[in-house]
């Protein structure tokens, strides 16, 4: 799997809702209306990630959930991460 250049990542970010390129990963934090709404979103993303065998790091802080995407075995951001970011946007309704 080929690691994307910073320019390729920045170009992909133009089509992604509120994602940022931070510390060599794609990151997005979402504040949900309730704690359980955030947990529901995490469950939907987790189920989808299992089908794709590509798993985001997920940080839960009360109503704020942060998804972090990086292809660990490639040691960088790949097309799999861009695709998963789009999938997460679709799954959470953004």
Swiss-Prot record:
Q: Name one Pfam family in it.
A: Pterin_4a
Keyword set includes Lyase = yes
Specify the signal sequence span: none
InterPro entries with a match to the protein in the record: PCD_sf (IPR036428), Pterin_deHydtase (IPR001533)
In terms of superkingdom, the source organism counts as: Bacteria
**Keywords recorded for this protein, A-Z:** Lyase
* A GO term for molecular function: 4-alpha-hydroxytetrahydrobiopterin dehydratase activity
Enzyme Commission number(s) of this protein: 4.2.1.96
Q: Which GO terms describe its biological process?
A: tetrahydrobiopterin biosynthetic process
Q: Does the keyword Lyase apply?
A: yes
Enzyme class, spelled out: lyase
Family per UniProt? Belongs to the pterin-4-alpha-carbinolamine dehydratase family.
Q: What is this protein called?
A: Putative pterin-4-alpha-carbinolamine dehydratase
Which species expresses this protein natively?
Answer: Mycobacterium leprae (strain TN)
């Amino acid at each position: 799997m080929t690691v994307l250049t910073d320019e390729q990542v920045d170009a992909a970010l133009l089509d992604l809702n509120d994602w940022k390129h931070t510390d060599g990963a794609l990151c997005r934090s979402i504040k949900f209306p309730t704690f359980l709404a955030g947990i529901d979103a995490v469950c939907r993303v987790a189920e989808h990630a299992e089908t794709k065998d590509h798993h985001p790091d997920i940080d839960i802080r009360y109503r704020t959930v942060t998804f972090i995407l990086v292809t660990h075995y490639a040691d960088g951001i790949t097309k799999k991460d861009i695709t998963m970011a789009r999938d997460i946007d679709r799954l959470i309704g953004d």
